[in-house]
């Protein structure tokens, strides 16, 4: 059934704020939480109302059905989460006066986990990881495959993962995401294919979960790499205006930092092992622009892997030797391999056992007999 804004019972931002005020009164947070600017989401027929601390930092979101005026409790930030984030802001203010506090060194062992990454992440201690690098699973790249009921369900799951990654990351450290728009192929000849701008939705999730945007790196593949998707072939034959579709040969590598009142150079100046800092210095031949030309990787064992070279660059540029590098969607272990190769520790999680078995094999091969002292979860 199609709706337009005439059907909305929540018509204005003020209407949304009034409903939000009732919600905050109900959960007894009306005196400590403010509203950001409410926005209507035409795709899902809801109002999204940012929830902020009194200092202006975003701590969550209220989602209101624009037609029924009901609050979507499943998609609205939970009271416990709001309270924890408010307490976190207060603790952060207290730390501002302690400028001599040094960089924390994680004691986490190398870890391989089998299972849902959201659940596995909960087993990691807070502030036990120094870098997160991952490529999230594609959203329903094939019409016959539907792991998620909707794109919104997919984003909700990804936000939960990002939330846990924020918790386990050390202060001021980085989370780097390899992601690209997704083409949903048409289910029949009478339907059009659809391209979803996934990276831009992920950006919103990162900001909501307490990260700050640092850089957008463009991974450029050789010109012929994108033809496998079939995109652009029809135009190359007919050349009709309005049918132009460029062949995608790029992906995003988005860089975010866990918010901190400390500057980035604090990570270097206050590191307790200055020899490790020197040993981690990036060598000549590094990337000087945000355009990285790297050939894609292919594997008969996994349909979607990124190249080892990409993982190595990210690890070298955003971590020190002996740091812990986390990949919550570990696949066959590319990130973990790159970590071992570059003298870092790793934590790598994967849902499917066949990939975990390959991951373990690939990591041990990369280690070439070096003792890794791996902690296995659910294995």
Where are the language model's segments positioned?
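Exposed beta-strand-loop-beta-strand "reactive/processing" segments of non-cytosolic proteins
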Residues: 27-67
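DnaQ-like (DEDDh/DEDDy) 3′-5′ exonuclease domain used for proofreading
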Residues: 84-104
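Long, contiguous binding/interaction regions
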Residues: 2-7, 57-59, 71, 76
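A short, surface-exposed interaction/processing loop segment used at functional sites
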Residues: 66-90
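Short, charged, solvent-exposed linker or helix-capping segments at domain edges/interfaces
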Residues: 61, 73-77, 263-270
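Short, non-transmembrane alpha-helical segments in secretory-pathway proteins
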Residues: 1-38
């Amino acid at each position: 059934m199609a709706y337009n804004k005439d059907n909305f019972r929540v018509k204005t931002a003020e209407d949304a704020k009034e409903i939000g005020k009732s919600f905050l009164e109900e959960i007894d947070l009306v005196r400590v939480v403010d509203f950001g600017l409410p926005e209507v989401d035409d795709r899902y027929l809801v109002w999204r109302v940012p929830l902020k601390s009194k200092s202006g930092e975003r701590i969550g979101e209220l989602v209101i059905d624009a037609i029924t005026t009901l609050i979507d409790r499943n998609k609205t930030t939970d009271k416990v989460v709001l309270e924890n984030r408010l307490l976190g802001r207060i603790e952060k203010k207290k730390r501002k006066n302690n400028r001599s506090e040094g960089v924390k060194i994680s004691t986490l062992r190398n870890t391989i986990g089998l299972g849902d990454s959201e659940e596995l992440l909960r087993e990691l201690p807070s502030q036990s990881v120094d870098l997160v690098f991952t490529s999230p699973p594609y959203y329903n790249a094939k019409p016959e495959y539907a792991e998620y009921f909707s794109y919104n369900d997919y984003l909700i799951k990804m936000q939960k993962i990002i939330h846990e990654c924020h918790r386990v990351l050390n202060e001021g450290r980085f989370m780097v995401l390899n992601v690209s728009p997704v083409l949903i192929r048409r289910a029949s000849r009478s339907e059009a294919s659809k391209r979803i701008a996934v990276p831009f939705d992920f950006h919103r999730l990162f900001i909501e979960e307490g990260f700050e945007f640092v850089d957008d790196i463009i991974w450029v593949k050789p010109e012929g790499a994108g033809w496998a998707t079939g995109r652009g072939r029809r135009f190359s034959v007919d050349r009709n205006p309005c049918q132009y579709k460029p062949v995608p040969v790029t992906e995003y590598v988005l860089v975010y930092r866990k918010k901190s009142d400390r500057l980035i150079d604090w990570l270097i100046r206050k590191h307790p092992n200055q020899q490790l800092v020197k040993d981690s210095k990036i060598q000549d031949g590094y990337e000087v622009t945000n355009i990285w030309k790297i050939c894609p990787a292919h594997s008969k064992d996994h349909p979607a892997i990124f190249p080892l070279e990409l993982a190595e660059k990210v690890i070298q540029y955003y971590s020190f030797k002996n740091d812990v590098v986390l990949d919550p969607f570990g696949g066959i272990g590319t990130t973990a391999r790159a970590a071992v190769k570059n003298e870092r520790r790793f934590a790598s999680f994967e849902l499917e056992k066949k990939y975990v078995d390959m991951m373990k094999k690939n990591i041990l091969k990369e280690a070439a007999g070096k003792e890794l002292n791996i902690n296995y979860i659910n294995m």
